Amino acid sequence: MAPHTCQGIGDAACVIIESIPATYGFPMPLPGYLAAIKAACEKVGTLFIADEVQTGLMRCGALWGVTRYGVEPDLMVIGKGITGGIYPISCCVVSKRHAGWLSEDGFGHMSTAGGAELGCIVGLKVLEICQRPEVASMVRYISNFIRAGLDEIRDHHADFFTGIRQHGVVMGLEFNHPEGAKPVMKHLYENGVWAIFSTLDPRVLQFKPGILMTQELSEELLRRVEVAVGAARREILGSAQRKTV
């Protein structure tokens, strides 16, 4: 959403926005961008809904990534990591100001997979763990450690691995080929690492290390990334060279 398009959002009940869009390869919001959209929403009475499935739960160094940009959303969508992969659950979190209908109409929030009591228990524990001070410290350490290693890998393959987008452990790795992230994904998978290319920008690999990784595991991850990027580079550049002969 371009800032000038906010002028017409008064006709909309809500604006749903992914704090850092995953399928675009995690382009980082410009300073003031999300805050400007929230201000425009408030001006005309439109709700701001933040999709925090990818960026929440300390991945950006705060419990919710959108708050790192000075924004308090009216509603928030979370899932996946909320139960650490142990029990499937997703959530729509509503601010008190806009939650009256939940008590007025008990059927208003029913769903096919609703009432996940076990999932709620697991989710509460995950939230408690994420808010421990040592977890915030770990996120800072892991993001800095892995970034330093990725910078070295990029230096080794500068004609192919060209950029790193990052906020905490949310990262987009840029490659100098229209679909450069696809062979990197393939070779990572062959080396036991799961990271997917960005559907709407296949040059970029979505790369999100876990927030509780040890130094040893981080080092092993970087070794495997080095192997995968090198193999993808040879595959891509070798193919390009053969076409020019």
Describe each region flagged by the PLM.
Residues 1-245:
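Conserved N-terminal phosphate-binding loop of PLP-dependent enzymes in the Aspartate aminotransferase
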